[in-house]
Curated annotation (Swiss-Prot):
<dbReference type="GO" id="GO:0009554">
    <property type="term" value="P:megasporogenesis"/>
</dbReference>
<feature type="region of interest" description="Disordered">
    <location>
        <begin position="21"/>
        <end position="185"/>
    </location>
</feature>
<keyword id="KW-0732">Signal</keyword>
<feature type="compositionally biased region" description="Basic residues">
    <location>
        <begin position="132"/>
        <end position="145"/>
    </location>
</feature>
<keyword id="KW-0472">Membrane</keyword>
<dbReference type="InterPro" id="IPR044981">
    <property type="entry name" value="AGP9/17/18"/>
</dbReference>
<keyword id="KW-0654">Proteoglycan</keyword>
<feature type="signal peptide">
    <location>
        <begin position="1"/>
        <end position="21"/>
    </location>
</feature>
<protein>
    <recommendedName>
        <fullName>Lysine-rich arabinogalactan protein 18</fullName>
    </recommendedName>
</protein>
<feature type="lipid moiety-binding region" description="GPI-anchor amidated glycine">
    <location>
        <position position="183"/>
    </location>
</feature>
<comment type="function">
    <text>Proteoglycan that seems to be implicated in diverse developmental roles such as differentiation, cell-cell recognition, embryogenesis and programmed cell death.</text>
</comment>
<keyword id="KW-0336">GPI-anchor</keyword>
<feature type="compositionally biased region" description="Low complexity">
    <location>
        <begin position="23"/>
        <end position="79"/>
    </location>
</feature>
<feature type="propeptide" description="Removed in mature form">
    <location>
        <begin position="184"/>
        <end position="209"/>
    </location>
</feature>
<feature type="compositionally biased region" description="Pro residues">
    <location>
        <begin position="103"/>
        <end position="119"/>
    </location>
</feature>
<comment type="similarity">
    <text>Belongs to the lysine-rich AGP family.</text>
</comment>
<dbReference type="GO" id="GO:0098552">
    <property type="term" value="C:side of membrane"/>
</dbReference>
Length: 209
C-alpha cells in the first residue's frame, strides 16, 4: 500500500511539473483535477498516516488577447442623384354643362260632352181594382171547409194508363169496361178497404193518446 501511494504521488508531481513548463498562451486557465488517492487501509493492518502534500498551484498567466482594430465605417457616396421632381397634375377639366330640354306643358285632353240624361216619363196612375165580393165568399168558404179524409181508393195501386190499347175482338180476356168475372178485382177492393180501415184506426188511436 505504501508503494502504490508513493507512485501515485510522484506521478501527480510529474504531471504538475509538465503542465507548469508549458507556454502561458497555450496553457489552460484551469489545472486538471487530480484523482484523490485512497486513504482507507485494511482493518487488520495498522493505520499509516501518510504525509499530505499540497498540490502545486499552476501559475495563471494572463493570456494576452489580441486587440481588435476598430472597423472602418463604409464610405458614404457624396454624389447621390438628386430626387426627381414629381410632375404636378393639371386640374381636371370640368365637364360641359348639357342644357336640359325645356319641357312644354302637357296639352289638355278634350273633354267629351256627356249625353243628357233621359227624362223619365210620368207614370200614369192606374186605378186599383175594386175588391169583389165573390173573392171574400170563396176565402170564407175555404177557411170553413174541412180537409177531406183519405178515401180507401187513394191507398190502392194507381189506375192503368189511359193510352193502353183497347180490347180486341180476338182477345179472350175481358176489356177494362167489361165486368170482372174472375173476382180478383173484388178481392183487391176488399184488401184496400181493410188497409184503409187499419190506417184510420191507427190514426184515431194516435190522436186519442
Amino acid at each position: 500500500m505504501d508503494r502504490n501511494f508513493l507512485l501515485t504521488v510522484t506521478l501527480i508531481c510529474i504531471v504538475v511539473a509538465g503542465v507548469g513548463g508549458q507556454s502561458p498562451i497555450s496553457s489552460p486557465t484551469k489545472s486538471p483535477t487530480t484523482p484523490s488517492a485512497p486513504t482507507t487501509s485494511p482493518t487488520k493492518s495498522p493505520a499509516v498516516t501518510s504525509p499530505t502534500t499540497a498540490p502545486a498551484k499552476t501559475p495563471t498567466a494572463s493570456a494576452s488577447s489580441p486587440v481588435e482594430s476598430p472597423k472602418s465605417p463604409a464610405p458614404v457616396s457624396e454624389s447621390s442623384p438628386p430626387p426627381t421632381p414629381v410632375p404636378e397634375s393639371s386640374p381636371p377639366v370640368p365637364a360641359p354643362m348639357v342644357s336640359s330640354p325645356v319641357s312644354s306643358p302637357p296639352v289638355p285632353a278634350p273633354v267629351a260632352d256627356s249625353p243628357p240624361a233621359p227624362v223619365a216619363a210620368p207614370v200614369a196612375d192606374v186605378p186599383a181594382p175594386a175588391p169583389s165580393k165573390h173573392k171574400k165568399t170563396t176565402k170564407k168558404s175555404k177557411k170553413h171547409q174541412a180537409a177531406p179524409a183519405p178515401a180507401p181508393e187513394l191507398l190502392g195501386p194507381p189506375a192503368p194508363p189511359t193510352e193502353s190499347p183497347g180490347p180486341n175482338s180476338d182477345a179472350f180476356s175481358p176489356g177494362p169496361s167489361a165486368d170482372d168475372q174472375s173476382g180478383a178485382a173484388s178481392t183487391r177492393v176488399l184488401r184496400n178497404v181493410a188497409v184503409g180501415a187499419v190506417a184510420t184506426a191507427w190514426a184515431v188511436l194516435v190522436m186519442a193518446f
